[in-house]
Amino acid sequence: MFKEKKAPLVCKFGGTSVGTSSSIQRVCEIIRKEKPSFVVVSAVAGVTDLLEEFCRAPVGQKSQFTAMIREKHESIAKELGIDVAIEPFLGPLKQFEGAGHLQQEDQAKILAIGEDLSASLICSYCRANSLQLEQLEARQVILTDSQFLRAEPDLALMQTMWGELVLKENTIYLMQGFLGATASGATTVLGRGGSDFSASLVGELCEARELRIYTDVRGVHTADPKILKDTQLIDFLTFEEMQELASSGSKVLHQDMLKPCIRAKVPIFVTSTFDLTKEGTWICASLNEGVEGPEIKALSLKANQALWFVEYHSPLMRLENVLRCVRGLGSIPGVVMAQNSGVYFTVDWEENNQSMTEALREFGAVSCEGPVSLVALVGAKLTSWSMTGVFDALQGTPVLYWSQTDTVINLIINEESGVVVTKLLHDYVLGLNRSGL
């Protein structure tokens, strides 16, 4: 492993940033100008969805998804004027076109194809335009356990292997996001949105000076600009604030990707691939000296949630055991609200939740309500925030449950009220900010 005189810059480009030939050209321009040490890329926009459809499709219908994936990449390559061998990457698809049920290990091989293809396209185009990149194979860097579809990185093993890599100075390395491998070499994936996680792990390994996330928005906004029109760009967020937003519905960053950056103290800058203003949001351990944000900085909305409550049958029950049980069933707890008598938590709603109910009965009486929406107000020093104004802003909209910590106020409401409540609270927060309260 080399040590640069200047700490490395890691750049990550999401699916929308590599979704068309013109966007790939833009990515090449950014790489040429910024000269990052490491570039991590997602699959072409929409391709992971097609690969998931392939895995679910019955025998006889899988081949249509193979054809769509082939056509999408061949079309981009043609528009870019490059010659890329697409067919070798499609081998696992052809292999399983006649298969019914796919094992998780086989699904991981299939889902990884998207990033393998996009990395090949981008590397070929950059080289064709006199920008020399070296490909860094993710399966040799992101080493994981054998939970094939939501693998956990083995950080100790990764650090050992990273130290043994022979990397050249003054070289740009391009790596696939989202995927990794077990110690024995079997392909694994990190779960949807896992390319962010891959990039943050690389940032931790190389002790990066900055992790720059390029996406289709300029940064983190006061609410999702795809839901509300009058959102504002946030200049700075702490890691803790971004963690709350990510766990409660914000789609800007993957929930797990913050942990490596927190451990290694790597600041994150979120910006747009397509906006030439270079505006964005800094996410770091603490706000820059002299910068004071509003008490409530942002809102997030997470729809189609289930609100579970486990009322402990013994005071010896432990929260971590409940959450371990939930994760063992393949669900990811979003908001967790602990009480002395039990715990409330949210996960994605499923009509058939019998297996979750039966598993949780080990800890106490179980109830579930859903589907519901979760609206979170994220900021700083919120334990002292008066809830009167929040409830007044809701204009009588029923709240099923709410909780308040130093960094987040969580509201559980009826599913159909999610967007309306987000708009009402966003107007309330912006009004306070404008008045300086």
UniProtKB/Swiss-Prot annotation:
Q: Which gene encodes it?
A: lysC
What GO molecular function terms would the record report? aspartate kinase activity; ATP binding
Q: Which domain of life is it from?
A: Bacteria
The name under which this protein is listed is Aspartokinase
Matching PROSITE patterns:
ASPARTOKINASE
Q: Is Nucleotide-binding among the key words of this record?
A: yes
Q: Which residues form a coiled coil?
A: none
E.C. number(s) listed in UniProt: 2.7.2.4
Q: According to its UniProt record, which reaction does this protein catalyse?
A: L-aspartate + ATP = 4-phospho-L-aspartate + ADP
Biological source species:
Chlamydia muridarum (strain MoPn / Nigg)
* Keywords of the record: Amino-acid biosynthesis, ATP-binding, Diaminopimelate biosynthesis, Kinase, Lysine biosynthesis, Nucleotide-binding, Transferase
Q: Which NCBIfam families match?
A: asp_kinases (TIGR00657), PRK05925.1 (NF004579)
By sequence similarity, the record places it as follows: Belongs to the aspartokinase family.
UniProt pathway = Amino-acid biosynthesis; L-lysine biosynthesis via DAP pathway; (S)-tetrahydrodipicolinate from L-aspartate: step 1/4; Amino-acid biosynthesis; L-methionine biosynthesis via de novo pathway; L-homoserine from L-aspartate: step 1/3; Amino-acid biosynthesis; L-threonine biosynthesis; L-threonine from L-aspartate: step 1/5
Query: What do the Gene Ontology cellular component annotations say?
Result: cytosol
**UniProt entry tagged with the keyword Nucleus:** no
